[in-house]
Amino acid sequence: MKKLLIIFFINIFAVNSAYSVDEVLTSLKEGGKIIFIRHALAPGNGDPENFDLNDCSTQRNLNQRGIEQSKFIGSIFNKHQIKIENVYSSEWCRCIDTAKFAFQNYQTFSALNSFYDIRFEANEERQITQLKEFINQWNGKENIIFVTHFVVISSMLNIGTSSGEIVITDKNLNIIGSIDTL
């Protein structure tokens, strides 16, 4: 774990931040930030044809490294005593598992679901609208976390993310920084 924390501090905000590590951590401690987390490592791409939202055995799931990565994500928030109001997760098992291993407490939110697959791509506009409305109604006092998918983060923030990457924004979705946890 100590080695992972050293790697974290070497890599944190290396490319995607206009702020130093201390400034970003201070910003998170102030609250009022939206934290997008792409689910941890789940080998493969998309989901199998027999995908069933209610059956994790039909989905692409976290591997052991993804589970460890999820726990590491949680340790970042614990180590720096960053307060979280709520953790919201996509209903996909890999997102739920990321949220569970990182933060224990979470609730699912269908607006965070993937629309990568042709079966779900028609949901994009409705989901993004719902997510933006949710953010607009949020009081913005404490930090909130969204554990979701590449396509949702890309649609919301116009950036690409790696597995387990943490992207921090303000309420207006201005990117403050990102943490690559690989």
Language-model features, listed with the residues they occupy:
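Sec-dependent N-terminal signal peptides
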Residues: 4-13
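Active-site-proximal alpha-helix that buttresses catalytic centers in soluble enzyme cores
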Residues: 21-119, 159-182
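Short, surface-exposed amphipathic charged segments that create phosphate/polyanion-binding patches used
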Residues: 120-128
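Boundary at the C-terminal end of the N-terminal hydrophobic targeting segment
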Residues: 14-22
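A short, acidic, amphipathic alpha-helical segment used as a generic capping/interface helix at domain edges
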Residues: 127-138
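Glycine-rich phosphate-binding loop signature in dinucleotide/nucleotide-binding domains
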Residues: 80-82, 138-142
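Generic beta-sheet signal
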Residues: 32-34, 140-148
